[in-house]
Each structure stands twice: as structure tokens, then as C-alpha cells.
Amino acid sequence: ISMHVSFSLADAETLPFPDHSFDTVVSSLSSCTFPNPVRVFREMARVCRTGGRILLLEHGRSDYGWLGHWQDRHADKFAEALGCHWNREPLQLIEQGGLKVVRSRRTFLGIFHQIHASPP
């Protein structure tokens, strides 16, 4: 298989690509750092072709009550120190961004989300 690969440095909220440019969009452990994750997910939807795949590995607020509450108590300090908002709800943000969740699975005490989404 011959492939041409190129790399671009860009703002995730305003990607420099035409609509429907990609068959697959992949993002890993990044939405916690986006100032406006909903806008980023809208951009993913825009650049992914109709029928394409958006594959995400994200972390967020645990669905284990005690751990989710602990994350909430320490979220501000963690975000200030590391720029990571670790108690966001990835599935809600993805849907607010206009993506359709095809399949999702939570792992590691409900913190990690493996998500297959598609553009609307």
C-alpha cells in the first residue's frame, strides 16, 4: 500500500480543510484541553465525509459515584495545574457538537470512553 501522509499544525476549532475532506477523523485524549470542545466536535463533523468515521478515545467524569465526586472536588485545581478538565462529559459534548454516537464503551472505572461517532 502506498500512502501520502502530510502533517498540519492548526487550530482544532477552525481547521484549514474543505468540508468532507476525510474518511476518518481520529482524536485521542484531547477534548479535556479544548477551550470550546463543542466547537471542535462541530469541526470534526464538518471535515468528515458523509458516511465517514470519527474515532475518539477520551477521558471524563467517572460514572462510579465516589470517583466522579472526587474528580469534581479536585477539578479546578487539576485544570489550573495541567490545563485538563478531567470531569467533562465527553458523550454529551460530542452530541452537542452535532455528532451521532454510533458506539461507545467506558473502561477503567468509567473514566475512559472509546467512541465511534459519525457526522450527522
Residue ranges of model-derived segments:
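A short SAM/SAH-binding and catalytic strip from SAM-dependent methyltransferases
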Residues: 23-36
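C-terminal lobe and adjacent flexible extensions of AdoMet/dcAdoMet transferase-like proteins
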Residues: 114-120
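A short glycine-rich, Lys/Arg-flanked "PGG" loop and its adjoining helix->strand segment in the class I
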Residues: 38-50
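Conserved SAM-binding strand-loop segment of SAM-dependent methyltransferases
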Residues: 2-13
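C-terminal alpha-helical "lid/dimerization" subdomain adjacent to the S-adenosyl-L-methionine
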Residues: 42, 55-114
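Short conserved AdoMet
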Residues: 2, 35, 49
